Design a protein with these regions (language model features):
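Bacterial Sec-dependent N-terminal signal peptides
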Residues: 1-26
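Sequence/structural signature of beta-propeller domains
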Residues: 20-290
């Protein structure tokens, strides 16, 4: 957490250079409730078997089921594996993919995604495969901080990663196979996200991708990508929405493709203190009807 705060303070002089988007009055955000201390570092959200889940971002990996009406923890599952900086969980029909690829300073050489079969999870057999990877173009020095990553989604036979670029305030999309092994990620495209991308939610039925993030002042934003050709998100129609409620937004999930849940990490700096929270937002008025 302190590393993130330090980087934010370092980037404050760049604020006048950042592109601005417009906050919309009809963007309805509902604060569900505060999150418990066990998940105040929440970095991801996902639905599984009708329940909303998050997990801790380091140490012994545990899953926490959250009550969607209160944000309270309903149950806890200890997966028996340690993670260094877990930032995202995505899934397909058969597997969960745990993204241990957080890298604030761009120095890690052990980036990986842990794969767990849903059938094993339900049987309480926690056997993980590993998808290890590196970036083909990772910079050195301060620019290495453009290779942090907190957003990933599974589509077809691939995993799509969106970097969190502390220096350029943009994001680059990379792709990996979903099968265990060691890979060099393939670079697809770069786009100006107007801030730090921290979560991804792909709607398979409507072929829509929603990215979550926050800008240099910690204001959350959403980037909706639609009308793209196949998996070429670079050609998508993009709409960026500012969210007036909350700070450092970290995880996003939807069960129906209309109402989205997202989380805010706990934040404390000088005289500013914010508890971790679960929020809910209705995006029906901002997405194309399919």
């Amino acid at each position: 957490m302190m590393k993130k705060i330090a980087l934010i303070l370092m980037l404050l002089p760049l604020m006048p250079m950042l592109a601005q988007s417009v906050a919309l009055d009809n963007l309805q955000v509902h604060r569900v409730g505060s999150l418990a201390k066990e998940v105040e570092g929440t970095s991801t959200l996902f639905f599984l078997d009708g329940r909303l889940w998050t997990c801790n971002d380091h140490g012994q990996l545990r899953l926490f089921a959250l009550d969607t009406l209160t944000g309270h923890i309903d149950s806890v599952v200890d997966l028996g594996v340690k993670v260094y900086d877990l930032e995202e969980v995505t899934q397909d029909d058969r597997y969960l993919y745990f993204g241990d690829f957080g890298d604030n300073n761009g120095v890690r050489n052990d980036l990986c995604i842990l794969r767990l079969a849903k059938s094993d999870l339900r049987k309480k057999r926690y056997r993980f495969d590993t998808i290890a990877f590196s970036y083909p173009d990772r910079a050195s020095g301060v620019l290495a901080r453009n290779f942090d990553c907190e957003a990933c989604t599974a589509i077809g036979d691939s995993l799509y990663l969106f970097t969190k670029q502390w220096i350029s305030q943009g994001s680059t999309c990379y792709v990996l196979p979903k099968t265990p092994g060691r890979y060099v990620a393939k670079r697809l495209f770069h786009f100006s996200s107007r801030g730090l991308v921290t979560g991804a939610c792909y709607l398979h039925g409507s072929r829509c991708l929603v990215l979550l993030g926050y800008n240099i002042t910690l204001q959350p934003f959403l980037c909706i990508l639609e009308d793209f050709d196949g998996k070429s998100f670079g050609s998508a129609r993009r709409l960026t929405l500012d969210i007036s409620l909350g700070t450092q937004a970290e995880g996003i999930a939807s069960r129906d493709g209309r109402n989205f849940f997202f989380t805010n990490e706990a934040f404390e700096l000088a005289f500013v203190s914010r508890k971790a929270a679960l929020q809910k937002i209705d995006l029906r008025g901002f997405m194309k009807k399919k």
